[in-house]
Structure formats: structure tokens, C-alpha cells
């Protein structure tokens, strides 16, 4: 209960201080200040330790409000009956609701004034624009038509350039593909010719090797027959020489 009452007092004090900035609201603040007196008296009667520390600050702010608005205390007893004490919170809440309604109505009035001022300025500006646009509407239409034509030409030229660029890229790609195919075919032919030549060389080398073997075998046989003939001739010569020498001695 004390916490809620503290919150209501702080909120009501802040709203009253905001309203006290304008002298036109002084007459409205009388009953709110009276409600604050009642709420502070109820808070003192509760005897809450935390609330007791805050009460002097509340009283200072309330006294400043009274001085600034010229509030006059109504004479009467400050003692409260139990029924009056139970109605303090309702009185504070009603005062808060009324202050909020006042603030909302004030904000609504200010917003309405701003909107009315903006609408008047818009009407004046629209009249000036209509007077100026009526004289230059033909020029605007002509310039807009020229701008549209220029934009269409620009986009047409851009599309043509893009198309030409794509065609040139396609031609270059086709030429490069054909060149690569020719190079690949030429390299394939060279490789196939080289493979054929290698096969032929291997075959010829095999044949030459066979011929060399045959020649070497023939040469070996010739030398062998020559050696045999030489040995036989030498043997015959020795026999003849020995017979001739015997005849001479005899």
C-alpha cells in the first residue's frame, strides 16, 4: 500500500510541476494540490520507515508548487476519519486520471494546431504550384517526352552494343574452338606418324640384326675353312720338303 501511494505521489507531483509551467493551469492545480496534501498526510500516518525518509522531499516540492501557483490552504481539521483515510488512494488515482486527460487534451490541441498550420501552408504552396505549373505544363510535357525518347534511344543503343559484344564473343569463341581442334588434329597426326615411323624403324632394326648375325656366321665359317686349308697346305708342304731333303742326301 505504501509503495503504491509513493508511486502515486511522485507521479502526481511530476504532472503538477509540468502543468505549473503555464499560468493558465493554475486554477486546475488547486484540487490536485489538495489531493497531494491528503495523500501525504495518509503516508505520514502509515509510519513506513522508507516512506518517512521521502516525505520531506515531497513536502518541499509541494510547498514550491503552492508558492508558484498561489495556493491558499482551506482552514479545517487535518485529522482524518477511517472512511476518509480509505478514500485517499481513490482520490489520488482520480487526480492522476484527470491530469492525464488534461495532458492528452493539451497534446491533442497542440497537434491540431500544427496540422491546421501545415494544411494552410500546403494550400498556399499548392496554389503557387498550380499557378506555376499551368504556365509550364506544356514545357514539362515536351521535356518529359524528349527525356523518354532519349532514354529509349539510350537503352536501344545499349542493347545493340550488348548484342554486338555477345556476337563478337561468340565468333571469337568459335574461332578459338576451331583453332584448338585443328591443333589437336595436327598433333594427333604427328603422333600417329611418329608411332608408325618408330614401328618401321624397330622392324628394320630387327631385320638388320638378323642380317648381321647371318654375316657374322658366314665370316666365322670362312675363316674356319681358311684355317683348315692353311693347316693342310702347311702339312703337305712339310711332307714334300722332307722328301726332297732325303733325296738330296742320298
UniProtKB/Swiss-Prot annotation:
InterPro entries: Vesicle_transport_protein_Use1. Keywords: Coiled coil, Endoplasmic reticulum, ER-Golgi transport, Membrane, Protein transport, Transmembrane, Transmembrane helix, Transport. It is found in: Endoplasmic reticulum membrane. One of its GO terms (biological process) is protein secretion. The chain crosses the membrane at residues 222-242. Residues 197-221 form a coiled coil. GO terms for cellular component: cytoplasmic side of endoplasmic reticulum membrane; endomembrane system; endoplasmic reticulum; SNARE complex. PANTHER family: USE1-LIKE PROTEIN (PTHR13050), VESICLE TRANSPORT PROTEIN USE1 (PTHR13050:SF7). This is Vesicle transport protein USE1. It comes from Drosophila melanogaster. The lineage of its organism: Eukaryota, Metazoa, Ecdysozoa, Arthropoda, Hexapoda. The gene is Use1.
